C-alpha cells in the first residue's frame, strides 16, 4: 500500500514523531491512522525503557500558582542535556504537569515510589471490604482496586487533564521518543492554603 505524504504529515503533526517513523507506522497499520498512533506510542514506550537508565542531570524547576492564589506547585523535570531543557516543548510539558499536580493532587511521581507498607495497608483495607467474597476472586479484586489507587496517587499513572486519552507517562514517553533523551519528573511539592491545619 502506498502511503501518501499528506497522511505522513498528519501523523507527524499528531505525534511529533519523525517522518520515517510515521511512514513505517502507517505501513505497518495499513494506512489506519489510529493504529499508527498506537504503534508509535508503543515504540515510544520501548524507547523510553531503553533510555531509562541514562543520567538526567539537566532540566528545569517550574512554578505554577492557580489564579486564586490558594494552590501552588513546584515541579522538577530532568533530562540529559540543557539543549532539551531549553526547548519550548519540554518547558510546556513541565508547566502542564505542574498544573496536573495542582488539579489532581498526586502523592507520588511513580508507582515504584509508593512505600511497600502503604501498598500493604491499602491491600488490607480492600480485603476487609470484600471479606465475604470467594478467596479465588479476592486477589483479583484487590489487584484491580490497587491499580485504581495508583491511578489516583501516582502522577505517571494519572489520566492527563488536557487529553483524557493519555496517561502522564505516555506524554513523557512520547517526548523521550521525540528527543532521544531520558526525561523524568524527579519530584514535586503541592501547596494549598489551609491544608494540614486544624483548629
UniProtKB/Swiss-Prot annotation:
Keyword Secreted: no
InterPro entries: EF-Ts_dimer_sf (IPR036402), Transl_elong_EFTs/EF1B (IPR001816), Transl_elong_EFTs/EF1B_dimer (IPR014039), Transl_elong_Ts_CS (IPR018101), UBA-like_sf (IPR009060)
Cellular compartments per GO CC: cytoplasm
Subcellular location, record wording: Cytoplasm
A Pfam family recorded for this sequence: EF_TS
Residue ranges of the region described as Involved in Mg(2+) ion dislocation from EF-Tu: 81-84
Taxonomy, superkingdom: Bacteria
Keywords tagged on the record: Cytoplasm, Elongation factor, Protein biosynthesis
Keyword Acyltransferase: no
Cited PROSITE patterns: EF_TS_1 (PS01126), EF_TS_2 (PS01127)
MF terms in GO: translation elongation factor activity
Function: Associates with the EF-Tu.GDP complex and induces the exchange of GDP to GTP. It remains bound to the aminoacyl-tRNA.EF-Tu.GTP complex up to the GTP hydrolysis stage on the ribosome.
UniProt similarity note: Belongs to the EF-Ts family.
NCBIfam families: tsf (TIGR00116)
Protein name as catalogued: Elongation factor Ts
Name of the gene encoding the protein in the UniProt record: tsf
Amino acid at each position: 500500500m502506498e502511503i501518501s505524504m499528506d497522511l505522513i504529515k498528519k501523523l507527524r503533526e499528531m505525534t511529533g514523531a519523525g517522518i520515517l517513523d510515521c511512514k513505517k507506522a502507517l505501513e505497518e497499520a495499513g494506512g489506519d491512522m489510529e493504529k499508527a498512533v498506537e504503534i508509535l506510542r508503543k515504540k515510544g514506550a520501548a524507547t523510553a525503557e531503553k533510555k531509562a537508565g541514562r543520567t538526567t542531570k539537566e532540566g528545569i524547576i517550574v512554578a505554577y500558582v492557580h489564579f486564586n492564589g490558594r494552590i501552588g506547585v513546584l515541579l522538577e523535570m530532568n533530562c540529559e542535556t540543557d539543549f532539551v531543557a531549553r526547548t519550548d516543548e519540554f518547558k510546556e510539558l513541565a508547566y502542564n504537569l505542574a498544573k496536573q499536580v495542582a488539579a489532581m493532587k498526586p502523592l507520588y511521581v511513580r508507582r515504584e515510589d509508593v512505600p511497600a507498607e502503604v501498598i500493604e495497608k491499602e491491600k488490607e483495607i480492600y480485603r476487609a471490604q470484600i471479606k465475604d467474597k470467594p478467596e479465588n476472586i479476592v486477589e483479583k479484586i484487590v489487584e484491580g482496586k490497587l491499580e485504581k489507587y495508583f491511578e489516583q496517587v501516582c502522577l505517571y499513572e494519572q489520566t492527563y487533564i488536557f487529553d483524557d486519552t493519555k496517561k502522564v507517562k505516555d506524554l513523557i514517553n512520547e517526548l523521550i521518543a521525540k528527543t532521544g533523551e531520558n526525561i523524568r519528573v524527579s519530584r514535586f511539592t503541592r501547596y494549598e492554603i489551609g491544608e494540614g491545619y486544624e483548629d
